[in-house]
A protein has these predicted regions:
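Conserved cytosolic headpiece of P-type ATPases
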Residues: 1-148
Length: 148
């Protein structure tokens, strides 16, 4: 569960929210865009996540598992399947339900989700690169001469 203004600690698949299942996220720290992005609940999940603000903290009424594709760098694709009721109910997830690590929840009181990727497997971490060591041409030549 994340609340308004929180930064997502991992890549999370959205299950429900205080805002009729959907939410807005701010990704300016990731891609520089100032516009809020809308994320929507998968159709049909609302019946499983009938949560109110009053009973949110102790909610544990849904049992199932989420299968997701192998971690990849593409920020604009995501595929996953949520299995509920012992696998008899399946719900497909896409990029419209993915809350990226490092993004912030905005204009939505709370969201509930299932962690899809953590640590080095998050899309942002897969896209991060180590900084290059920068040196001038002259410094490189001097280093070679010092070695000989």
């Amino acid at each position: 569960m994340c609340e308004d203004g929180d930064t997502f600690p991992a890549d999370i698949a959205l299950m429900t929210s205080s805002d009729d299942g959907g939410c807005f996220i701010k990704t300016s720290s990731l891609d520089g865009e100032k516009n809020l992005k809308k994320r929507i609940q998968v159709k049909g999940l609302k019946a499983y996540f009938d949560v109110t603000n009053a009973n949110l903290k102790q909610y544990n009424g849904v049992k199932g598992h989420l299968e997701v594709e192998q971690p990849n760098k593409d920020l604009h694709t995501f595929k996953g399947t949520l299995y509920l009721d012992g696998g008899s109910k399946m719900f497909s997830f896409s990029q419209d339900q993915l809350l990226l690590k490092g993004a912030n929840l905005a204009n939505t009181e709370w969201v509930v989700g299932v962690v899809a990727y953590t640590g080095e497997q998050t899309k942002i971490m897969l896209n991060s690169q180590k900084g290059r060591v920068k040196m001038s041409h002259l410094e490189g030549m001097v280093n070679q001469l010092v070695i000989y």
